[in-house]
Each structure stands twice: as C-alpha cells, then as structure tokens.
Regions:
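Active-site metal-binding motif and surrounding structural segment of the metallo-beta-lactamase
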Residues: 1-33, 185-204, 213-220
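Active-site environment of divalent metal-dependent phosphoester hydrolases
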Residues: 7-13, 40-43, 78-80, 98, ...
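Alpha-helical scaffold elements adjacent to nucleotide-binding pockets in ATP/GTP-utilizing enzyme cores
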Residues: 13-18, 53-56, 60, 237-240
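Flexible, acidic/histidine-containing loops and adjacent segments that form or flank the divalent-metal
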Residues: 22-163, 251-291
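Conserved phosphate-coordination/catalytic loops
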Residues: 142-149, 201, 231-235
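Long, well-ordered mid-to-C-terminal structural blocks that present hydrophobic/aromatic surfaces
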Residues: 155-208
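C-terminal regulatory/interaction regions
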Residues: 173, 180-182, 189, 209-213, ...
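Short secondary-structure boundary segments
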Residues: 223
Length: 291
C-alpha cells in the first residue's frame, strides 16, 4: 500500500521519483495506491515514456493501473476502514466535505486549462495587429501566485559591452513605472542588447507601453511550452514585441527560445502562422543553449 497524503511539495518529491522509475522500468508501484489529490500533482519530464512536463500524477497512475492492475483509490475520507493482510486501517481525516472541495477545485482548474487552450487556438486565428490591443491585467496581490510573480527580481545586467534586461516573472507595470521614474521614455528609451521576456512569454507580463520605452531587437523567451495549467509563450506577447507603436519595423527582431519550437508548440500551443516571420520582419532561433 502506498498513500499520498496530500499535494504539498515536501510530501510528493519521493513519490514522483518512484512513479517515474516504475514507468521507466515497467514494474508495479504497489498493489494499492491511495491518492485523493493526484490531479494536482505535476509529473516531471520522463525520458522513456515521453511524458510532458505538466502531466498530472493521475494520468501516470492510470498508466500503471492499466499495465499492472494496481488498485487506485481517490475517494478516501474519514470513517473508511479496511483490513489488509498486514494491518487494519481506519481513516480519520479528511472530512468528506473537504475531499469534495478538492474534487471541485480540480474540476475547476481542468476547465481553466481547457479555456486557456481554446484561447490560444482562437488567438491563432487573429492577426498580430489585432492582438496588440490586449492590455495586461493588474496583478491580484491577494493571490499567492500573482504576489510571488509581482515580487520577482528584475534587473539590468551590464558586462563589458553587453547589456541585458532580465525580467524574471515580474509584471510590466512595476518595471515601466521604475524606468519612467529614472527618466526613460518613448523619446529616451532604455537601450539594451537583449531582453529576457517575463514569465515565459505570458500575456499578462509584457505590455506595449513597457516595450515602447525599451530599444531592443533581441528577445529571449525561456519556456518548454507550459504545463497543465498554462501555455507559453502567448501569441499576444509575440504580438506586443512585434507591433508595439515604437518598434522600428525596418530592424529585424530576433526571438530566442531555449527549446525547439516544435516541442514548445506540442507542450503548449502554436503561436505563429505561416508567413508571419517575413510579414513582420522577425526570425526564430530555437533550442538555443548559449548566445
């Protein structure tokens, strides 16, 4: 019997590694698995099963279940009792109401994933110029994830003749405010050799107004396409980079990705249409490990 009590990081690391090893070696995990929260837990990339980052533990448990006929229970709540050959077990928590809250939240997040995927598909049908009208939303600092991103360290790195604006996962409003306070503007832009685009190219972390006060033709986007809760880069972000008002259309823009474009789009969603590189005078450099 293997029991995954809940989905905090400090409780799942060893189990994730064990599940990955069992899939690699084609061996059974256990005769029975208890895991109410498997839908929350993301699996790391698995070399032999071609599992994508972001595949949930529930998917992998189903694979093991089919291969090795393990019993997987995801309905455990207080009052459940069972007798095993080596012990008797009685579940004393969680209450059924809490278990149902977890199920509801998983279902809601599943719907959000479908909505996000559909949004990327819909955006592919829209022109680059149309997408530039999107205005990034203000972060909700009452949400843990958005507070964490808002606290992200962004910096200007200068070394010899090289300068890079490294934006971490920060929000554009904070960076734009700071740069304007330092005297940068549309008529006096910050000039850098590279911009590391914020938050893997998420649509809410890059804005036209920020790009309008930066002069740069080379943009680094660090992403493998996203995970089960988001897809990156957003086509909207690409649109901002290519079409913000102050961009010099005569200068070619270079987009650098640390993974192959095919992998990024397979994990996430397509973000470019045929012919757009020529139309908007930009070039994709993928699977880049050094600049």
């Amino acid at each position: 019997l293997m029991v995954l009590t809940h989905y905090d990081d400090d409780h799942i690391g060893g189990i994730l590694q064990l599940v990955g090893t069992c899939l690699d070696d084609n061996v059974a995990l256990a005769k029975e698995v208890w895991a109410n929260c498997a839908g929350y837990v993301e699996m790391a990339e698995n070399k032999s099963t071609n599992a994508k980052q972001g595949v949930t533990l529930s998917v992998k448990l189903n694979e093991l279940k089919e291969k090795h006929e393990i019993i997987w229970r995801d309905d455990l709540s207080e009052g459940f009792k069972t007798n095993l050959p080596f012990a008797s077990i009685e579940v004393v928590s969680p209450p059924e109401t809490i278990r149902r809250m977890v199920i509801k939240k998983q279902e809601e997040e599943g719907q959000q994933l479908l909505k996000a995927s559909q949004m990327n598909i819909d955006n592919l049908k829209k022109s680059i110029t149309e997408l530039t009208e999107y205005i990034p939303k203000e972060p909700d600092l009452n949400k843990d994830a958005e507070l964490a991103n808002a606290s992200s360290i962004a910096l200007i790195l200068k070394c010899d003749d090289l300068s890079i604006l490294m934006l971490g996962d920060c929000y554009p409003q904070n960076v734009e405010r700071y740069l304007r306070e330092k005297g940068y503007s549309e008529d006096n832009p910050l000039v850098v050799d590279f911009v590391k685009v914020s938050h893997h190219g998420s649509r809410n972390n890059t804005s036209n107004s920020l790009l309008d006060i930066i002069r740069c033709d080379k943009f680094i986007i660090s992403t493998n396409g996203g995970n089960c809760r988001s897809n990156h880069p957003d086509r909207i972000t690409i649109a901002h980079i290519l079409c913000h008002e102050k961009r010099n259309k005569d200068r070619k823009v270079h987009l650098y990705f640390n993974h192959k474009k095919e992998l990024i789009e397979a994990n996430g969603a397509p973000f470019l249409n045929a012919g757009e590189c020529k139309e908007w005078n930009f070039e994709i450099h993928d699977n880049i490990t050094e600049l």
